[in-house]
Swiss-Prot record:
HAMAP family registered for this protein in UniProt: OMPdecase_type1_B
Family recorded in the similarity comment: Belongs to the OMP decarboxylase family. Type 1 subfamily.
Cellular component terms (Gene Ontology): cytosol
Residues at which substrate binds: 11, 33, 60-69, 120, 181, 190, 210-211
GO MF term list: orotidine-5'-phosphate decarboxylase activity
Quaternary organization: Homodimer.
Enzyme class per UniProt: lyase
Pathway connected to this protein: Pyrimidine metabolism; UMP biosynthesis via de novo pathway; UMP from orotate: step 2/2
Name of this protein: Orotidine 5'-phosphate decarboxylase
Substrates-to-products reaction catalysed: orotidine 5'-phosphate + H(+) = UMP + CO2
Active site: K62
Organism: Photobacterium profundum (strain SS9)
Length: 231
């Protein structure tokens, strides 16, 4: 696939298990997401190993800091050669704009830069607990609009917000959606979930899927089935 929609979340207890999984799937069938746990344990060398296997990597570290510090972290991700990197939209416009600007020298080789809006585990009561009075959907739109105005490529959002965001922010604004569960999968700790077909129909551009693929007896077959459903 030239532009696979599935991003597999590599949430493994150790590097060997992750690399064993990677050996079982075709690089062109998906992209891989490396999050905080695995990056903290195994660092940039782990990402380099994934690149050596032919895979594109979404570095999901959700940078959130003062503009100078955040932008330098984003530049470090670009130097590592990742396909996508993210920041927290709640860091504000100056932080996001600085992160965007620092990628300009990379031209067409720069990673996609996206922002996290409202974590998919959060409900209205969770937002209220941190002093945000609006509903999750309203806060997602607020932060996604700020992200677009800051010049970023897109946002992480739940599939339930995808149609709203595509309508409000345009088709070119990329939507990356976690909380995706193929039919028959458990919801786990995600609160706002959809199937792959539902999510793409709603407007999501890329789908983050973890355990339904990584814990499958035949992950390549599960991935192929998902890709076929989206063809």
């Amino acid at each position: 696939m030239l532009d696979p929609k599935v991003i597999v979340a590599l949430d493994y207890p150790n590097q060997d298990a992750a690399l064993a999984f990677v050996d079982r799937i075709e690089p062109g069938s998906c992209r891989l997401k490396v999050g905080k746990e695995m990056f903290t344990l195994y660092g940039p060398d782990f990402v380099r190993k994934l690149h050596e296997c032919g895979h594109s990597v979404f570095l999901d570290l959700k940078f959130h800091d003062i503009p100078n510090t955040c932008s330098r972290a984003v530049a470090a991700a670009a130097e590592l050669g990742v396909w996508m990197v993210n920041v927290h939209a709640s860091g504000g416009e100056r932080m996001m704009a600085a992160s965007r600007d620092i990628l300009e020298p990379y031209g067409k080789d720069r990673p996609l830069l996206i922002a996290v809006t409202v974590l998919t585990s959060m409900e209205a009561s969770d937002l209220a607990g941190i002093g945000i009075a609006c509903a999750p959907q309203e806060q997602v739109l607020n932060l996604a609009t700020l992200t677009k105005n800051s010049g970023l490529d897109g946002v992480v959002c739940s599939a339930q917000e995808s149609t709203m965001l595509k309508s409000a922010l345009g088709k070119e604004f990329q939507l990356i959606t976690p909380g995706i569960r193929p039919v028959g999968s458990a919801a786990g700790d995600q609160r706002r979930v959809m199937t792959p077909v539902e999510a793409v129909s709603a407007g999501s551009d890329y789908l983050v899927i973890g355990r339904p693929i990584t814990q499958a007896t035949d992950p390549s077959a599960v991935l192929a089935e998902i890709n076929q459903s989206l063809a």
